[in-house]
A protein has these predicted regions:
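Helix-rich interaction surfaces within compact, conserved domain-sized segments
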Residues: 191-244
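Short acidic, glycine/serine/threonine-rich loops at helix termini
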Residues: 59-61, 177, 221-224
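Short flexible coil/turn linkers enriched for glycine and charged/polar residues
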Residues: 41, 157-159, 204
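Short Gly/aromatic-enriched secondary-structure transition segments
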Residues: 176-183
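Conserved phosphate/anionic-ligand binding catalytic regions in large, soluble enzymes, centered on
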Residues: 152-171
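C-terminal non-catalytic interaction/assembly regions of soluble proteins
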Residues: 1-133, 170, 186-202
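Structured beta-strand/loop patches that form or line metal/cofactor-binding pockets in enzymes
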Residues: 134-152
């Protein structure tokens, strides 16, 4: 519960001589009522810490966390013994002059031809989004997983995630393009409710693409989520129930 997480954070911080730069708690309710296996009866309580000094997040931290948990949580166990911290990375966007990146065409006979950079370039400008088709006429609906009619793929782009969703028929596209809005996505994926989301229609593919900014923290190597590359984000969306 939230109260337990707050209490754990307070008690752990009091036990530490130095507080890490970042400390995050998550509770995954993987437990089931009247489970027939121990794993099925257990929840996963995770604490992630980050700091530039490996000593602060190493054995000093893990030992304090384990000792505190053993003294307070009945049935507490760990997924790994106390140990040293692991290196993580931070994604930062950067740019280099185009002339500094060699572009070479290699022909089948092995001949290499340098390709000079373009002499003229244009600034990126916004493109008018394609118009949406007329929504389907109102009628009876069924409460079903979105994946009943829609496919999806997802993945990482720096600290953001892409989700592409598509359907097979024009009738389904009329529904998808008008029903799966940014607001609808926020409701279906509550973890993205407070994040900036971009929506891009691809009518020739009967598809819509979403970009969820910042959901991966500072990139894949930052390990902000248990699914750091957002590969399962699309399947989570497909599993959510909607009125079709």
């Amino acid at each position: 519960s939230l109260d337990q997480m707050v209490r754990s954070l307070t008690e752990l911080e009091a036990a530490l001589t130095v507080r890490p730069a970042e400390l995050e708690w998550t509770l995954a309710r993987t437990d089931h009522v009247d489970a027939d296996t121990e794993q099925g009866a257990s929840a996963l309580y995770s604490c992630v810490v980050r700091d530039a000094d490996p000593a602060i997040v190493g054995r000093r931290f893990t030992s304090a966390a384990v000792e505190l948990a053993l003294a307070s949580y009945p049935g507490f166990t760990t997924t790994a013994p106390p140990g040293d911290g692991q290196v993580y990375g931070v994604f930062t966007a950067g740019y280099v002059p185009i002339a500094e990146v060699a572009h070479v065409a290699v022909h089948p006979d092995g001949t290499r031809v340098p390709i000079p950079p373009a002499d003229e370039t244009l600034d990126l400008t916004d493109v008018e989004p394609p118009s949406t088709p007329q929504p389907p006429e109102s009628g009876p609906t069924r409460r079903l997983p979105l994946g009943t009619i829609a496919g999806a793929r997802s993945g990482d782009k720096g600290g953001s995630a892409n989700i592409g969703v598509w359907v097979r028929t024009d009738e389904q596209w009329r529904w998808l393009s008008t029903a799966l809005t940014v607001d609808a996505l926020r409701e279906l994926l509550p973890e993205a409710a407070d994040l900036t989301i971009g929506r891009h229609l691809l009518p020739e593919l009967r598809a819509v693409n979403f970009v969820i900014e910042g959901i991966l923290g500072q990139g894949v190597a930052y390990q902000a989520r248990f699914d750091p590359q957002a590969k399962g984000l699309g399947e989570w969306l497909r599993s959510r129930y909607v009125d079709i």
